[in-house]
Regions:
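Conserved beta-sheet core of the metallophosphoesterase superfamily
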Residues: 146-149, 163-169, 230-290
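Cap/insert and terminal regions of metallo-dependent hydrolase folds
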Residues: 91-99, 119-120, 124-133, 221-263
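N-terminal active-site segment of His-dependent metallophosphoesterases
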Residues: 3-135, 208-217, 222
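Active-site surface patch of divalent metal-dependent phosphodiester/phosphate bond hydrolases
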Residues: 128-146, 150
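Short C-terminal domain-edge/linker segments immediately following a structured domain
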Residues: 95-101, 143-145, 178-182, 214-220, ...
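Conserved catalytic scaffold of divalent metal-dependent phosphoesterases
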Residues: 51-57, 64-75, 104-105, 118-123, ...
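A structural signal for short coil/turn segments at secondary-structure junctions
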Residues: 107, 142-144, 247
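Short beta->alpha connector loops
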Residues: 48, 70, 93-95, 129-133, ...
Length: 290
């Protein structure tokens, strides 16, 4: 398994358990149907799955799955004549069948971080459709021990913009925090934009929400939108990055804008894991891929 080591810097670094020390090249790529711009324009795309090692995970927790922007659907041959499901509905079982058996998981306890945008229109003829992602959350909740997550700007939950209920092992975050396996997660849903539109806030509002969440001493900050990464050309918001660099170092998991490199480190030691259109499993350094 090829890994890209994270260079050490002479700066304050992440405290606690969640410092990422390496991230692999994709160990598998799952084919799926991606939407085109008109009827019949859909095509087969691939979802890469990476393994990231962290310095420490709480006792009893073997892995955390992080993903976002799974805006596709399963292939027709996998649907067995049924309506094709969202990629996020089928991914939980695919990971169990093809990825998790390759890892050393003494307890089998796994958590999930969902960073938003899991909908694609059934006809696969439109990019950026908005719709119900409740079944994605339910599917991950059935297969894994707990979920934390935020809404993307294309997500609804039934006829509601945010969940009126969720699986008992799931925590929906929009300026809230939740603790699972001693890790405190905080989250901000939506993106920066016109606040009169679905799941959008002004940049000032978005930054205020981040400050509120981080003030609760979060270990992991989950965002849909997020900071840029100028050193590697990663798209994002400059003001969010500048704010995060003034706050205590943390691990940020974000989606919304795809980066060529999934991991960046800000000037204050904050790490940003970009999971847009990819899936990353965070495991202990001692976990081996068979």
């Amino acid at each position: 398994m090829k890994k890209c080591a994270i260079p050490n810097r002479a700066i304050t670094v992440l405290t606690g358990s969640m410092k990422i020390t390496s991230i692999s090249q994709p160990i598998v790529e799952f084919p799926f149907l991606n939407a085109g711009k008109r009827v019949g324009d859909f095509y087969v795309d691939r979802l890469p799955v990476h393994i990231a090692t962290v310095e420490h995970l709480p006792d009893g927790l073997d892995a955390i799955i992080a993903t976002a922007d799974l805006q596709g659907r399963e292939r027709f041959q996998e649907a067995n004549g049924h309506p094709i499901r969202l990629l996020g509905e089928v991914l939980p079982q695919k990971l169990i069948d093809e990825v998790i058996p390759k890892l050393q998981m003494p307890t089998g306890r796994i958590g999930v971080v969902l960073a938003g945008d899991f909908y694609t229109v059934p006809a696969l003829n439109k990019r950026g459709g908005t719709g119900d992602v409740s079944e994605v959350w339910q599917s991950f909740a059935r297969q894994y021990d707990w979920i934390v997550g935020v809404a993307g700007n294309h997500d609804t939950f039934g006829d509601q913009p945010s969940p009126t209920y969720s699986p008992t092992n799931a925590s929906f975050l929009d300026t809230q925090t939740a603790v699972h396996d001693t890790i405190r997660f905080g989250g901000v849903s939506g993106i920066i934009g016109n606040p009169n539109r679905h799941w959008r806030s002004t940049v000032e509002q978005y930054c205020e929400k981040i400050e509120q969440v981080v003030s609760e001493k979060t270990d992991v900050l989950v965002l849909h939108d997020g900071p840029d990464a100028p050193d590697s050309g990663g798209k994002g918001n400059v003001m969010v990055r500048e704010l995060l660099e003034l706050l205590p170092p943390t691990l940020v998991i974000r989606g919304h804008a795809h980066w060529k490199s999934p991991l960046a480190e800000l000037d204050n030691g904050t790490q940003v894991l970009n999971v847009d259109a990819r899936c990353v499993l965070l495991v202990r350094e001692t976990a081996a891929v068979n």
